[in-house]
Amino acid sequence: MTWLEIVVLALIQGLTEFLPISSSAHLILPSEVWGWQDQGLAFDVAVHVGTLLAVMVYFRADIFNLLNGWIKQITGGGASQESRLAWAVILGTIPACVAGLLLDSWIEENLRSALVIALTTIGFGVLLGMADRKEGTRDIDQFTLKDALIIGVSQALALIPGTSRSGITMTSALFLGLNRDTAARFSFLLSIPLIAAAGLFKGLELADTGTSSQWSEIAGATLISAVSAYACIHLFLKFLQKIGFMPFVIYRMLLGAGLLVWLYVA
């Protein structure tokens, strides 16, 4: 990979991982549209580590409180809002992990294409727009384990390129009557174990291949994806209540339509 490709792809990962527009779709597109070579496992691991660091640093206080509440409960203490939310994150993670283990290889072989990305980008964009119009008023205090399970099941759909993990989880949360801030924050917290698991899986796969890598390139990709992801999370949460999800819906419509036109012309 050239440094231009590293910078562009790491920025794409960092800026799209937590926005409802699908990071996997945007990482596939350069190879489909520009003919860039696949970035490889080492790069995938690097940008996963970068985005994981970003979300963990940003939500470090929340993570500490959730872990503290969860540990207190399982060691004999009483239940709390923090322990309940920790269980919600655990419960919401299970469906996507199971689906990933069972279906990831099949999806990679059969659904990793520009046409699938175009259709899912448009289809799930429409759902996000409908959900945003239905935004509820429930906050984190009214969040239930049933909500977590439903959102977790929907998260499994993000294995399909173009769906967007953050997009589908926020869509489900909004349909359940949660407000925008709660939908976004739970989606970000829910991303932590999944990104960690994906990074670990790819890391083990990389170790098995014995592929040598340029550490400067890995460090650069990690740093760029981490900084851009952190900035993206901060700005997204800052402006979400003002702008809602419609700018992302419009972007998805334009991207999907543009891809369909490109496929037709090509």
Curated annotation (Swiss-Prot):
Gene Ontology cellular-component terms listed: plasma membrane
What residue intervals traverse the membrane? Answer: 1-21, 39-59, 87-107, 111-131, 143-163, 186-206, 217-237, 243-263
Q: Which residues form the signal peptide?
A: none
Q: Reaction catalysed? A: di-trans,octa-cis-undecaprenyl diphosphate + H2O = di-trans,octa-cis-undecaprenyl phosphate + phosphate + H(+)
Q: Does the keyword NAD apply?
A: no
- Give the domain of life: Bacteria
- Miscellaneous notes: Bacitracin is thought to be involved in the inhibition of peptidoglycan synthesis by sequestering undecaprenyl diphosphate, thereby reducing the pool of lipid carrier available.
> What does the sequence similarity comment in the record state about its family?
Belongs to the UppP family.
Q: What is this protein called?
A: Undecaprenyl-diphosphatase
Species of origin: Hahella chejuensis (strain KCTC 2396)
- Lineage, please? Bacteria, Pseudomonadati, Pseudomonadota, Gammaproteobacteria, Oceanospirillales
